[in-house]
């Protein structure tokens, strides 16, 4: 699959915390840094996401939130 987004981070899923409708997915990227995303349970199922899965996080610059 080819996409135009330039902000892509490859890594391995190190945690999946499922809620009622969504799940928190933690991806460990190069250098040991972690990226956390909230995605739907349907997406978890469709993509086969589980601990150990190799994934690429695609980040749209207009959808970034910074927490302090």
From Swiss-Prot:
Disulfide bonds: none
Highest taxon of the lineage: Bacteria
Keyword rRNA-binding on entry: no
Pfam families in the cross-refs: TOBE
Keyword field contains Zinc-finger: no
Mop domain location: 2-68
Example GO biological process: molybdate ion transport
Record's keyword terms, sorted: Molybdenum
Stored NCBIfam families: Mop (TIGR00638)
Record's function text: Binds one mole of molybdenum per mole of protein and contains a pterin.
Stated name of the protein: Molybdenum-pterin-binding protein 3
Organism from which the protein derives: Clostridium pasteurianum
């Amino acid at each position: 699959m080819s996409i135009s987004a330039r902000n892509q981070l490859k890594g391995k899923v190190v945690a999946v915390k499922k809620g009622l409708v969504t799940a928190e997915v933690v991806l460990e990227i190069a250098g040991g840094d972690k990226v956390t995303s909230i995605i739907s349970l349907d997406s978890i199922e469709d993509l086969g996401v589980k601990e150990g899965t190799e994934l690429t996080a695609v980040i749209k610059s207009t959808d970034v939130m910074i927490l302090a």
